[in-house]
Amino acid sequence: DRTYAEKALDLFKRILRNLATPGLLEPKYLPTLQARGHSITMILINTASRIRAAIADPALDKQIDDSIALLQKDFMHPEFNALLETVGSNGEFIDTINGRIINPGHCIETSWFILEEAKYRNWDKDLLQLALQILDWSWEWGWDKEFGGIINFRDCRNLPVQDYSQDMKFWWPQTEAIIATLYAYQATGDEKYLQMHQQVSDWAYAHFPDKEYGEWYGYLHRDGTVAQPAKGNLFKGPFHIPRMMIRGYMLCKELL
């Protein structure tokens, strides 16, 4: 039913208007801090691409281009080999406890959004190079060489991180890494990415599933032991795990 696609497109355009019109939305940051966030920039890539699969519109392609350009220009900071979560309004580095934050799982998720777009464009070389750079940087920051798994937060100067869960292992960074490494292997044929995929997949499936009752726990200590047994809450719903399984199945089917 095309009417649902049209409704989704209309809502997407309204969201863009709200984001672009000062005063319509409550400011995310205090007026004293002019900043922009990684979250909305990256999620608009995926949202636009999902709507585009149902209905074509130039606004969708434009938003994908704009978001990718912003990520490359403002959020990627080669001096730290990192994609930062919060930057100044023109991409300036904010040398505070919030401005130094790296969220490896979030960045890895961004990398596969861009890999997916590169694939859509017949493996566009520039997008592929950008996505792999983000993935490589973020894996280096995120993979816990001592205990395994993707860690929650890092500081780009290796200073203390504010969030108390900074060294925990949440479920969703692992699922995003499983997808991203498989996409990267499909794009390049580089065995490095297949090994990374097996690494994170093996670790996730060894630690997150409840072997007695099924489903995944959401929150592990750094060493992989369960921090709390709830399998669903305000943040953990039926999204990241099914998406990982569906995407993984589709990619493996293409590869095999």
Regions inferred by a protein language model and the residue ranges of each:
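Glycan-recognition and catalytic cores of secretory/periplasmic carbohydrate-active enzymes
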Residues: D1-L256
